[in-house]
């Protein structure tokens, strides 16, 4: 039996907007369509990510979007991938996710990151100067653990809802710091290799070598992000991938991140250094037909020992995006 056939598969969604969308509503509806689709395919979980002031990403109000998705699905685990904790008071996060857990018990994850999820001007608009910064992240995680855990004698501040909910906390990151912290706290770890694969192997090694068993986890559990573009043929997948290339190129250039239709060729659309940067961004990508995808994922599992794969997929046509995840799901039976 192949490793892929027994590895949980999950989704990270940013509610991507298209260049022809009139507002965010179509993107949010597509996120729901995706959640319903992957639920039927047997995916383990779907997370949405917090980003601010990024034209083309509609998942900024992460907890609100999770409530919408959870209300319209029945079994799929849903969570944040992640909440950028420096943007929020831990008590507010505990109340939001405590509410979600009360409404949808056993289905909510709380993934936490310490990156801004925004530029400096936006960070100021979020009042981050009043909330502290990334250096406070370990203490903020501990505070969240207390707020979501069992009520302690003499505890003056409680999250209602939230206390006694024990919402599963994941630590997210693309750095060695996050790996070390997840190991120290005995928490599951998700590495952001879908856009920053450079330190993946080093981070996983640190996480596993330094892992300390905890009340929530007795051994390391690592999930890695993988960009996925699957199609019936390698040629079609390469063509469809140009939408992802254009989006990453726009990110590099500081332009709108709305999804654009695929193009026959990227020649003349990027400079050599930009092409290299896009390639680095997608260093872990699985792009191709079913057999190429299967081989790529098996290699990634062998190289990383990942316990779970979390896919991202930037395709312009919603039906082709759903098909991409369907192809990946069908590979588990082979």
Which residues does each PLM region occupy?
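N-terminal beta1-alpha1-beta2 module of alpha/beta enzyme domains
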Residues: 1-73
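Hydrophobic faces of well-ordered beta-strands that scaffold small-molecule active sites
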Residues: 9-13, 46-48, 78-80, 108-112, ...
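A conserved active-site cap/scaffold subdomain adjacent to cofactor or substrate pockets
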Residues: 179-198, 203-204
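An alpha-helical appendage that flanks or caps ligand/catalytic pockets
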Residues: 130-158, 199-306
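Active-site mouth loops of central-metabolism enzymes
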Residues: 13-29, 83-90, 163-173, 281-290
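Acidic (Asp/Glu)-rich catalytic clusters
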Residues: 2-5, 39, 66-74, 101-108, ...
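Flexible, glycine-rich active-site loops centered on histidine and acidic residues
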Residues: 6-24, 86-149, 189
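Conserved, mostly hydrophobic/aromatic
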Residues: 9, 38, 42, 50, ...
């Amino acid at each position: 039996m192949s490793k892929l056939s027994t590895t949980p598969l999950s989704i990270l969604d940013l509610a991507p907007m298209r260049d022809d969308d009139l507002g965010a509503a179509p993107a949010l509806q597509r996120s729901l369509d995706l959640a319903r689709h992957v639920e039927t395919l047997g995916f383990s979980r779907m997370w949405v990510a917090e980003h601010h002031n990024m034209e083309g990403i509609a998942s900024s109000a992460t907890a609100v979007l999770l409530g919408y998705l959870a209300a319209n699905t029945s079994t799929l685990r849903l969570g944040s991938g992640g909440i950028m904790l420096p943007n929020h008071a831990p008590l507010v996060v505990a109340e939001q996710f405590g509410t979600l857990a009360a409404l949808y018990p056993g289905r909510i994850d709380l993934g936490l990151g310490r990156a801004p999820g925004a530029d400096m001007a936006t960070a100021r608009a979020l009042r981050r100067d009043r909330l502290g910064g990334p250096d406070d992240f370990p203490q903020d995680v501990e505070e969240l653990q207390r707020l979501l855990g069992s009520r302690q004698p003499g505890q003056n501040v409680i999250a209602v809802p939230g206390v006694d909910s024990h919402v599963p906390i994941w630590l997210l990151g693309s750095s060695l710091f996050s790996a070390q912290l997840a190991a120290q706290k005995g928490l599951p770890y998700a590495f952001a290799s879908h856009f920053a694969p450079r330190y993946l192997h080093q981070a996983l090694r640190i996480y596993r070598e330094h892992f300390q068993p905890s009340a929530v986890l007795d051994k390391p559990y690592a999930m890695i992000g993988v960009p996925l573009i699957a199609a019936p043929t390698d040629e079609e997948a390469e063509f469809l991938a140009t939408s992802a290339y254009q989006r990453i190129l726009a990110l590099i250039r500081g332009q709108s991140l709305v999804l654009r239709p695929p193009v026959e060729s990227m020649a003349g659309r990027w400079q050599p250094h930009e092409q290299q940067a896009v390639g680095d961004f997608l260093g872990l990508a699985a792009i191709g037909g079913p057999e190429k995808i299967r081989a790529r994922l098996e290699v990634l599992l062998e190289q990383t020992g990942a316990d779970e794969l979390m896919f991202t997929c930037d395709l312009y046509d919603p039906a082709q995006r759903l098909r991409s995840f369907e192809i990946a799901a069908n590979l588990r039976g082979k």
